[in-house]
Amino acid sequence: MKKVVLVSILSCVTIAVTAQSGKYFEPENIKTVMQKTAKWQLKNPKHEPNDWTNGAFYAGIYAAWETTQSEDLYMALLDMGNSTQWKPAELWYHADDIAICQTYIDIFRKEKKQEMIQATVNTVSKLLANPYPVRGIEVIKWWWCDALFMGPATLVKLGITVKNDEYLKKNDEYFKECYDLLYNREERLFARDLGYVIKNDDKDRWEANGKRIFWSRGNGWVMGGLVRILKELPKDYPVRPFYEQLFKDMAAKIISLQQADGLWRASLLDPDSYPGGEVSGSGFFCYALAWGVNNNLLDEATYKPVVKKTWTALNDCVNDEGRVGWVQPIGADPRKNFTADSWEVYGTGAFLLAGSEVIKFK
């Protein structure tokens, strides 16, 4: 009798959990949680509006506005642009400082006001015309993998918008410099920067299990950035196949590293050393994989269940107020320094981008 009762209780719990997670995929519920998280984050700012962190956040806000058509969200976008005078951050040569320009360009496409992109045009023109101004260091312009989210979409969006192919060509040049430096073809993952590239000397960095260090959010930046490139490049653009193949190769690797709870760990190849899912990297993976399914680059039968598992887990990391938790703070490598109370604006941005694609599932 006790066994029957226990089985019945477990069955009820399973049904309840399944019903709850099923609600996460109802379009109106997706819109509701997107607005809830967006509004919480807008009320709790942490950085300068044109900081790189907000480059990711406002990309998510724009995606949330496209999804919900919320007037409040659109006004938040305009308020942000007006507060910065539509300017990038200070370092013209640094990919981080033009991340916000992705959203300026998106808004310009609607509003057609030149002042919304003029500073972006000026900054990108300077970037293309001058070497990286770090004396004593020989370095490429995009020398860390996070840059592949920050810079490429701005160059490609701008090139498409103003009909200047030079921006697209330079993006391809800078992207492939970073790819050649940091992409591990065997693992199909990016090292965060040159310090994490294995050289077989005493300066190598390894995880506790002997595996190489590949950071979840770093690779999330890359995959999210690839989506934002591919959304812009014409189907017949000569170098598009390179980006499509890289996207597919990374996607296949990434799904093999998903953990049982639906999230990825801060360290992709040593999950046991980093208990607890990390939401910013997982959010960008969810966004990228969902976009790949929606655009027929990834097999639906293989990838859709992965995305659904991730979206369910991401929703479970949103508290009642709308705060997206379990986000690793700003850094450059896997850490264990986050909890349910840890949040950052880019974590919310990743969540919003993911929702904007999950809602398109049929």
Locate the predicted segments by residue.
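CBM-like carbohydrate-recognition segments
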Residues: S11, G22-G55, Y62-S83, K87-C101, ...
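Asp-box/WD-like beta-propeller blade repeats and closely related beta-sheet repeat scaffolds
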Residues: M116-L155
